[in-house]
């Protein structure tokens, strides 16, 4: 390819400014990927070899014969010497000419690449005749140059370089960052000097020594372009080039000027680093000198922090000032000003008395609180004061020196230890000092002896873990450079020179030795009491002696000052000389790691974090001083700019201009909060808030939904309010970009009223801070108020309203006024305010009886908007009323006592506070107030209607069964009511809502859900009122709902034999919610029953039998009875609690029905299948009932409930009809292309792994002879339809391996190139589950295999061609395929036929009829899934024999042989299986879900409350038309595809309990409304919360040697849109769930019986097929059973009368069902609905029911 490239540029000379020294010829078809680690290694070896040679060779000897290839150098010519740099490109010096120029001297050839020919490296106009430098030449800028000398020289030095001797010239490094340009220019100037171009370099006056020629200018331009890419140039350089792209001389001139300007900075740094002060000059002059230097450096951008400045100053102090050197050990945060205070104090004492020793102290408190310092010892400190704690208490000395040591820590660089510590640091320029980093301990000048040291003694240290001494004369058996790290109290390293033994010879002539470390960098010789204790020596500070544990005195302890010392006379001297120990390497490398390198090495952390980590030794191996921090401040990492992109920062106080530009109420902020779930429908789910920018006045309005008309009503209201009340006109309203604000309706309204909408920018919620903060504040207040008062959650908006009133009246700390005052309103009269939730007694002006009490307990909420009254909540009436007729309830029974607030709130104070308000009402009260109205006009919170599914416990302890008191009155006197029944009036059940309709007891952090069935976001509640509902044609109405009536005691069921009530399920028509209908008279009911259609006579009464299981036939033999019991015995059916009779008191009958529309559901198209009503007469037929919507509206009109909104008619539309302008949805791509994985992959490690996988795949393709390598075809000669595009795809597997696959583009394959009749088969999941189940029951061994590159073993019949892989470099050629390449349409079928033939002919297997990819013989069963095989056998040797045969033909890998008797873990087709033979098998996907779900970008809540069920029952999905643009629609559909795709994969693998929810949501993939997405998120959240759940199987222990195959069936009638029914089936083998199915019925059923028949008919075919599979795999007899909870279906199957079906449209299906049951020897039995586990397949269930039906088989 190189030759082709060069031939296209004949005008380019083959000479080059770079000479190649590689010794291998570059071939045109070489794989570019091979230029990797191995090639670099060869170059480095060549470079190393070059460095060892000392001779050079003329350039002419390197000229190759072939101008297109780099020839190897002659063996006699040694490669050039040029230091440690790679030798890919060198430059030679040929007298006075630039090296490598073809017409100046001999050219030096280099291999060319297309990158060199890029036009970007040539100036416009005529092309330069000089060759360009390749991008790979040069060395990284971070590589230190070995050349010494000045960065630039004058002409004389340049001329001196012009010698006749040729030498090789190293090119400059590549510029990699704009911050590195100053350093790069120096190396570039050096390069020009070495290239005999020193005369053209501008001097200090800006002019060159000689005039530059055109050829030299071209050379200058080309080399500058090569080694200084435009993207890395500083801005000022780009500005020069933008004017004249060839003006390199101006760039060099300005660079030299900048170097000169840095001289003053360098001088200041050198001066600061070499300060000396001993008091000979005034302290003021010294301070002025230092501060001036620091100020100049700071002004020039070189920041000198206090810590560095203090260290530099203290290092130069001497004489009486030297003790201040160690002040930094006491004061870590000392400033320069504080240090000079100490210097001034000593200087003044010096001047006052020259002969007195200074005893200056900064502060006495410092002496008490800080570690021991190195000051003089006027008042020395005590090291160990407590004799009892000498061994474990850390002394101050320890904190000042060595807090901890570690033998595993990397040793510090000891090169600097042997240097003189008193020698000042000499700096040549400012780059020698890296400012901002802390000086290490080794650079601090330590004196040999401190002033407070006792000479000839060792200081006893109770806190030091090691003994340290400064002299080496007492160290025995010393070894240099120990791998020990010792740090002082400030976590600084103390360099250690050697380690050895310290030997003692005590008074009792005993000798003892301990380990000792040698370092000259400490102030005292420290003797560790911890190490002495290790050799049985302790210090007794009461006797002042060292002694053994037996009391033997070894040596005296001397107290000098506050320290304790031991004489060195007890130490034995050694024969080791000091130079031996101190012989440490002194050649410290000056190379520093560049900050960009460290930045990338440490995961792109910021400089401050990296420096802090190095300073605190959290990162080891190198220190802070080893890094070049000069570019850290200005360095911009492009990866960080992209990966860490953030929103713009909002300027504090930026809204002041709005406050100055607008008058009050002209600029509003608004936002919507919601929805709040699990509330009654009368309670608002949202609220919208408004805030005035100038006055900060707030308004809040409740919302039940976010429809356009609802929002528009609120905007109309507030604009009229502001206009009329404040005589102002709103000019601007700021809001976010929610659809409720951006719709056309509101936009036209604002435009009509002349209001400017101000929207926030995309994803910039902070710009909407005013409204967002208000909502957050109000919600905080709401939660607090509800928690304090104990009121139920459905009163949440009342708490918001109360908070808004109060906060409008509170003064702002900033403006000193309240919002009401800014608005010109009077302050809030607190006497009119009651605490939120204050218990009160409200007068009932219209009781049901004159003898009933007139007082009703209630709870004060907030002042009324519409009157002078107060909004009060009456739990007994489930109302809020607006009234002034109330009395504050006094006594200890107030709701505050449950929070122990009695000490904070007092009734006396409350009465005194509200006295004036109540006296005003009393004095102006003329007649009894009649404002207590049950149908209150309060527009937002009256008639608190409970959720229709909420449970009602009318038999609470407060109500007796015989109590007939109406619900609105009380039977006890007011005193008892106020004292005992304030929280729970007898007529109301305290458990009536999720959070309790009355104030609860003190709420715990974990919500109690013992009697409340709800999901994490709500759940399903039971009915609280008697309801009527239409029924089906069948008088028996056998459905999946039939036995699921709920006891009002929260029992699962009740017996109808003990009551006069009949259970009637509320059907869900057309997918709408369940509408209740009013009670009707018995007479009317009987009238409607007369016109009822006749039912099937064969249907027996459903509730006459008390048996749970009813067979299709009456057992006539013991065998049949045993069969029934055997089928039921092993099934994982729930254990039900014992039933109890339920009685219904009279008050329950008198409660009126309440109807309202439903809120959004968690799963759509679902009616309340678990809600039941009671009537006193017979059932009614479905045909005679009006539609639910009509009845509900009539009920609403009849009851005249003005405060309730009637149910809205939902417009049902077809899902596809709602999709507008949908073209195609792109499939989800999880793989990477070649350019993503390799070419542009910035992750080097991952790139290398993909490259390795690439070569592995290519080698495998060649090994398998995938294509014909003997002949290449021209593309023009081949029919285009036979040419298949190919590509490499890359992906990372679950086990962490990186995979590359060369595939064909089968998606665009022409139909003529394959046989469409061929099929690619894989094992059915039911077959795999059946095989696994049989393996568990029969103690089989399970072996898992994998066949590498399986498709490539199959030959291809068709004539097909593909393009060669990229590494061959033949884009215009084609190769003919010989094997079935992955991706071809026919590859799967070809492989299936190949492996099938081999297994049958060579392995003696046969394929099970009807179950593809399941093979068996007498000993082994094989399940095949493409290239994965699972073998089952009783004898492991049988599996091994099959494996040996497979290995003879295929590359077979054993993934898991399965020979262990312990638990074995498999990963089979995505299932994570734990199997212990003969005991159990667990199937799950925890690891897979843990990895995949977080990648879906679903807002998970890992720390919050876990969901207990995947959805809520009883609600529906709104089907209003979507108003959404096409791009957003496609994005949401794509998101739904990902979420539902993963959920389906998991559900059909083993989470059969989720199939209903998955199937329902899958029907709405093309209808991605906000509600549907929320439901999907809820499902994914439940999967995340239960990702550890497993399908549990236990080995079957049968009573008979039979296999039992059972299908459990269920159906939900008409609960899907368009009256479609949901059907579900679960299949079990020997009591183990092996599969499940949930789907919407294809036909519209007209009754529950027909729906059940449809479900059973769907189950029987698969049941028969599974029966055949089980019999083929295991020769035992098989019993087939089918269970259903529909007695009507069983009766139809049982009946032999055909006449009754002739006029039935489901008669044909029923007759066929009879034939299938009788012809397949199928047993059909009745199962009670409460035990029907298939119920989870047809409808959403309450938590309790859901858990009850699933916890036996999945947990």
Swiss-Prot record:
PTM annotation, UniProt: Initially, virus-like particles (VLPs) are composed of the structural unprocessed proteins Gag and Gag-Pol, and also contain the host initiator methionine tRNA (tRNA(i)-Met) which serves as a primer for minus-strand DNA synthesis, and a dimer of genomic Ty RNA. Processing of the polyproteins occurs within the particle and proceeds by an ordered pathway, called maturation. First, the protease (PR) is released by autocatalytic cleavage of the Gag-Pol polyprotein yielding capsid protein p45 and a Pol-p154 precursor protein.
Q: Which InterPro entries match?
A: Aspartic_peptidase_AS, DNA/RNA_pol_sf, Integrase_cat-core, Retrotran_Ty1/copia-like, RNaseH-like_sf, RNaseH_sf, RVT_2, TYA
Q: Which residues bind Mg(2+) 1?
A: 671, 736
Q: Chief location of this protein?
A: cytoplasm
Q: Where do the segments described as Disordered lie?
A: 1-93, 126-173, 352-421, 956-1087, 1092-1111, 1130-1187
Q: Outline the segment boundaries, as ranges, of region: Integrase-type zinc finger-like.
A: 583-640
Annotated Low complexity bias: 153-165, 402-418, 960-969
Q: Which residues bind Mg(2+) 2?
A: 1346, 1427-1428
Motif Bipartite nuclear localization signal — list its residue ranges. Answer: 1178-1212
Catalytic reaction annotation: DNA(n) + a 2'-deoxyribonucleoside 5'-triphosphate = DNA(n+1) + diphosphate; Endonucleolytic cleavage to 5'-phosphomonoester
Give the molecular function GO annotations: aspartic-type endopeptidase activity; ATP binding; DNA binding; DNA-directed DNA polymerase activity; RNA binding; RNA-directed DNA polymerase activity; RNA-DNA hybrid ribonuclease activity; zinc ion binding
- Give the positions the UniProt entry annotates as the active site: 461
Q: Pinpoint the Integrase catalytic domain residues.
A: 660-835
Domain (RNase H Ty1/copia-type): residue spans on this chain: 1610-1752
- Keywords per UniProt: Aspartyl protease, ATP-binding, Cytoplasm, DNA integration, DNA recombination, DNA-binding, DNA-directed DNA polymerase, Endonuclease, Hydrolase, Magnesium, Metal-binding, Multifunctional enzyme, Nuclease, Nucleotide-binding, Nucleotidyltransferase, Nucleus, Phosphoprotein, Protease, RNA-binding, RNA-directed DNA polymerase, Transferase, Transposable element, Transposition, Viral release from host cell, Virion maturation, Zinc, Zinc-finger
Task: Provide the Gene Ontology terms for cellular component.
Answer: cytoplasm; nucleus
Its subcellular locations are: Cytoplasm; Nucleus
An individual GO BP term = proteolysis
What is the documented function of this protein?
Answer: Capsid protein (CA) is the structural component of the virus-like particle (VLP), forming the shell that encapsulates the retrotransposons dimeric RNA genome. The particles are assembled from trimer-clustered units and there are holes in the capsid shells that allow for the diffusion of macromolecules. CA also has nucleocapsid-like chaperone activity, promoting primer tRNA(i)-Met annealing to the multipartite primer-binding site (PBS), dimerization of Ty1 RNA and initiation of reverse transcription.
Q: What is known of its domains?
A: The C-terminal RNA-binding region of CA is sufficient for all its nucleocapsid-like chaperone activities.
Q: What is this protein called?
A: Transposon Ty1-LR4 Gag-Pol polyprotein
**Organism, per UniProt?**
Saccharomyces cerevisiae (strain ATCC 204508 / S288c) (Baker's yeast)
């Amino acid at each position: 390819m190189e030759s082709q490239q060069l031939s296209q540029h004949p005008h380019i000379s083959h000479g080059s400014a770079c000479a190649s020294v590689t010794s291998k010829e570059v071939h045109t078809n070489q794989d570019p990927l091979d230029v990797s680690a191995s090639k670099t290694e060869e170059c480095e070896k060549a470079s190393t070899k070059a460095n060892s040679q000392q001779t050079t060779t003329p350039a002419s000897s390197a000229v190759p014969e072939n101008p297109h290839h780099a020839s190897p150098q002659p063996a006699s010519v040694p490669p050039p010497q040029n230091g440690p740099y790679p030798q890919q490109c060198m430059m030679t010096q040929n007298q006075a000419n630039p090296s490598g120029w073809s017409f100046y001297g001999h050219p030096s050839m280099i291999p060319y690449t297309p990158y060199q020919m890029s036009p970007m490296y040539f100036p416009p106009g005529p092309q330069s005749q000089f060759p360009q430098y390749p991008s790979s030449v040069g060395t990284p800028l971070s590589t230190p140059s070995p050349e010494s000398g000045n960065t630039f020289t004058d002409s004389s030095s340049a001329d001196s370089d012009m010698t006749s001797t040729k030498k090789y010239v190293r090119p400059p490094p590549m510029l990699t960052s704009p911050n590195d340009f100053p350093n790069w220019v120096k190396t570039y100037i050096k390069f020009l000097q070495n290239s005999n171009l020193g005369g053209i370099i501008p001097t200090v006056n800006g002019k060159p020594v000689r005039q530059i020629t055109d050829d030299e200018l071209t050379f200058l331009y080309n080399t500058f372009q090569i080694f200084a890419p435009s993207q890395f140039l500083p801005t000022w350089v780009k500005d020069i080039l933008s004017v004249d792209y060839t003006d390199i001389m101006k760039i060099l001139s300005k660079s030299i000027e900048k170097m000169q300007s840095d001289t003053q900075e360098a001088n200041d740094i050198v001066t600061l680093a070499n300060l000396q002060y001993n008091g000979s000059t005034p302290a003021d002059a010294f301070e002025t000198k230092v501060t001036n230097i620091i100020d100049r450096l700071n002004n020039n951008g070189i920041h000198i922090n206090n810590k560095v400045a203090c260290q530099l100053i203290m290092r130069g102090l001497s004489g009486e000032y030297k003790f201040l050197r160690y002040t930094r050990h006491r004061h870590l945060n000392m400033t320069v000003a504080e240090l000079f205070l100490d210097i001034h104090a000593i200087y003044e004492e010096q001047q006052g008395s020259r002969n007195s020793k200074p005893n200056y102290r900064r502060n006495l408190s410092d002496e008490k609180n800080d570690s021991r310092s190195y000051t003089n010892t006027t008042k020395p400190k005590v090291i160990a004061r407590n004799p009892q704690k000498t061994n474990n208490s850390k002394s101050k000395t320890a904190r000042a020196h060595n807090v901890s040591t570690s033998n595993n820590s990397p040793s510090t660089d000891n090169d600097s230890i042997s240097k003189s510590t008193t020698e000042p640091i000499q700096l040549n320029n400012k780059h020698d000092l890296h400012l901002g980093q802390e000086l290490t301990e080794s650079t601090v000048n330590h004196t040999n002896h401190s002033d407070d040291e006792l000479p000839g003694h060792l200081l006893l240290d109770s806190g030091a873990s090691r003994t340290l001494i400064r002299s080496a004369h007492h160290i025995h058996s010393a070894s240099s450079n120990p791998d020990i790290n010792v740090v002082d109290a400030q976590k600084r390293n103390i360099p250690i020179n050697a380690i050895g033994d310290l030997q003692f010879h005590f008074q009792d002539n005993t000798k003892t030795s301990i380990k000792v470390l040698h370092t000259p960098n400490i102030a005292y010789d420290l003797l560790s009491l911890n190490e002495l204790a290790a050799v049985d020596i302790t210090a007794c500070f009461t006797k002042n002696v060292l002694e053994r544990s037996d009391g033997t005195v070894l040596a005296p302890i001397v107290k000098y000052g506050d320290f304790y010392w031991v004489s060195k006379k007890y130490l034995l001297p050694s024969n080791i000389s000091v130079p031996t120990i101190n012989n440490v390497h002194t050649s410290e490398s000056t190379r520093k790691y560049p900050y960009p390198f460290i930045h990338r090495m440490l995961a792109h952390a910021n400089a401050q974090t990296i420096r802090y980590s190095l300073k605190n030794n959290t990162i080891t191996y190198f220190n802070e001083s080893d890094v070049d921090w000069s570019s850290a401040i200005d360095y911009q990492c492009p990866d960080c700019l992209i990966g860490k992109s953030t929103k713009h920062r909002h300027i504090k106080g930026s809204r002041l201009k709005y406050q100055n530009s607008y008058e009050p109420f002209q600029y509003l902020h608004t936002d919507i909060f919601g929805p709040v779930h699990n509330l009654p429908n009368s309670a608002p789910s949202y609220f919208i808030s408004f805030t005035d920018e100038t006055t900060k006045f707030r308004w809040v309005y409740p919302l039940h939904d976010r429809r356009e008309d609802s929002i528009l009503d609120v905007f109309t209201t507030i604009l009229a309010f502001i206009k009329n009340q404040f005589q102002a006109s709103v000019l601007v309203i700021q809001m976010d970009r929610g659809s409720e604000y951006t719709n056309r309706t509101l936009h036209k309204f604002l435009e009509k009223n002349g209001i400017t909408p101000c929207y926030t920018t995309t994803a910039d919620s902070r710009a909407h801070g005013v409204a967002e903060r208000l909502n957050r504040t109000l919600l905080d207040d709401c939660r607090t108020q509800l928690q304090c008062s104990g009121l139920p959650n459905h009163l949440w908006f009342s708490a918001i309203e109360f908070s808004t009133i109060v906060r409008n009246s509170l003064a702002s700390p900033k403006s000193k006024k309240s919002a009401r005052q800014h608005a010109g309103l009077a302050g809030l009269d607190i006497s009119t305010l009651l605490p939120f939730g204050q218990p009160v007694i409200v007068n009932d002006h219209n009781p049901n009886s004159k003898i009933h009490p007139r007082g009703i307990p209630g709870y004060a909420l907030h002042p009324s908007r519409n009157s002078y009254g107060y909004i009060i909540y009456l739990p007994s009436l489930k109302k809020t009323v607006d009234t002034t007729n109330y009395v504050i309830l006094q006594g200890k029974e107030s709701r505050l006592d449950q929070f122990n607030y009695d000490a904070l709130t007092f009734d006396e104070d409350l009465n005194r506070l509200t006295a004036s308000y109540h006296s005003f009402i009393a004095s102006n009260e003329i007649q009894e107030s009649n404002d207590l109205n049950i149908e209150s006009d309060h527009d937002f919170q009256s008639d608190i209607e409970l959720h229709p599914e909420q449970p009602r416990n009318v038999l609470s302890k407060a109500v007796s069964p015989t109590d007939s008191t109406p619900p609105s009155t009380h039977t006890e006197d007011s005193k008892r009511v106020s004292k005992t029944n304030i929280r729970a009036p007898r007529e109301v059940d305290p458990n009536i809502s999720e959070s309790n309709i009355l104030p609860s007891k003190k709420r715990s952090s974990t919500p109690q859900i013992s009697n409340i069935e709800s999901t994490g976001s709500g759940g399903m509640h039971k009915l609280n009122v008697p309801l009527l509902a239409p029924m089906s044609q069948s008088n028996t109405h056998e459905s999946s709902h039939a036995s699921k009536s709920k006891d009002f005691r929260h029992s699962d069921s009740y017996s109808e034999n003990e009551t006069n009530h009949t259970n009637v399920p509320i059907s869900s028509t057309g997918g709408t919610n369940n509408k209740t209908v009013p009670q009707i008279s018995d007479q009317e009911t009987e009238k409607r029953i007369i016109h009822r259609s006749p039912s099937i006579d064969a249907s027996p009464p459903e509730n006459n039998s008390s048996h749970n299981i009813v067979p299709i036939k009456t057992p006539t033999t013991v065998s049949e009875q045993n069969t029934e019991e055997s089928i039921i015995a092993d099934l994982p059916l729930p254990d039900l609690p014992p039933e109890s009779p339920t009685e219904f008191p009279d008050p329950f009958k008198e409660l009126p029905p309440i109807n309202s529309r439903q809120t959004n559901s968690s799963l759509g198209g679902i009616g309340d299948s678990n809600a039941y009503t009671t009537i006193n007469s017979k059932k009614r037929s479905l045909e005679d009932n009006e539609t639910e919507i009509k009845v509900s509206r009539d009920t609403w009109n009849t009851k005249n409930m003005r405060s309730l909104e009637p149910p809205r008619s939902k417009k049902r539309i077809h899902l596809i009809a709602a999709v507008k302008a949908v073209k195609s949805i792109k499939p989800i791509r999880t793989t990477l292309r070649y350019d993503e994985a390799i070419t542009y992959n910035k992750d080097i490690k991952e790139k290398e792994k993909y490259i390795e996988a690439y070569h592995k795949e290519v080698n495998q393709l060649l090994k398998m002879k995938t294509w014909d390598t003997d002949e290449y075809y021209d593309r023009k000669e081949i029919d285009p339809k036979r040419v298949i595009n190919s590509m490499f795809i890359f992906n990372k597997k679950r086990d962490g391996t990186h995979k590359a696959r060369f595939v064909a583009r089968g998606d665009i394959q022409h139909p003529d190139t394959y046989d469409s009749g061929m099929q690619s088969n894989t094992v059915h999941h039911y077959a795999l589950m059946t095989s696994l189940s049989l393996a568990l029951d029969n103690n089989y061994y399970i072996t898992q295999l994998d066949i590498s590159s399986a498709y490539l073993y199959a030959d291809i019949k068709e004539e097909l061609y593909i393009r060669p892989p990229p590494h061959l470099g033949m884009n215009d050629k084609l190769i003919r395929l010989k094997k079935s390449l992955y991706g071809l349409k026919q590859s799967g079928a070809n492989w299936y036929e190949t492996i099938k033939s081999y297994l049958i002919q060579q392995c003696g297997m046969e394929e099970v009829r009807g179950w593809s990819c399941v093979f068996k013989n007498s000993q082994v069963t094989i399940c095949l899934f493409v290239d994965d095989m699972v073998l089952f056998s009783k004898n492991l040797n049988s599996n091994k024999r099959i494996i040996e045969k497979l290995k003879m033909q295929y590359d077979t890998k054993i993934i898991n042989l399965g020979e262990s008797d312990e638990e074995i873990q498999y990963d089979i087709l995505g299932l994570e299986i734990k199997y212990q033979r003969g005991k159990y098998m667990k199937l799950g996907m925890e690891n897979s879900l843990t990895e995949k779900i977080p990648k879906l970008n679903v807002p998970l809540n890992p720390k919050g409350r876990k969901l207990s069920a995947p959805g809520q029952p009883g609600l529906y999905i709104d089907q209003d038309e979507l108003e959404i643009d096409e791009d957003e629609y496609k994005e949401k559909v794509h998101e739904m595809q990902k979420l539902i795709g993963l959920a389906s994969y998991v559900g059909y693998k083993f989470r059969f309990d989720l199939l209903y929810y998955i199937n329902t949501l899958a029907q709405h993939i093309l209808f991605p409304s906000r509600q549907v997405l929320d439901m999907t998120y809820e499902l994914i959240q439940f999967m995340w919360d239960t990702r550890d759940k497993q399908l549990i199987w236990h080995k079957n222990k049968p009573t008979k040697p039979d296999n039992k195959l059972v299908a459990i069936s269920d159906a939900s009638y008409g609960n899907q849109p368009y009256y479609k029914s949901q059907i579900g089936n679960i299949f079990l083998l020997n009591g183990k769930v092996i599969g499940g199915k949930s789907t919407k019925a294809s036909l519209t059923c007209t009754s529950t019986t027909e729906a059940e028949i449809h479900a059973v008919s769907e189950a029987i075919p698969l049941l028969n097929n599974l029966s055949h599979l089980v019999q083929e795999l295991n020769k035992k007899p098989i019993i087939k059973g089918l269970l259903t909870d529909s007695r009507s279906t069983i009766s139809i199957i049982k009946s032999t009368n055909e006449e009754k079906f002739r006029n039935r449209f489901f008669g044909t299906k029923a007759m066929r069902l009879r034939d299938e049951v009788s012809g397949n020897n199928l047993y059909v039995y009745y199962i009670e609905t409460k035990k029907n586990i298939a119920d989870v397949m047809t409808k959403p269930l309450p938590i309790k029911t859901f858990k009850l039906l699933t916890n036996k088989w999945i947990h």
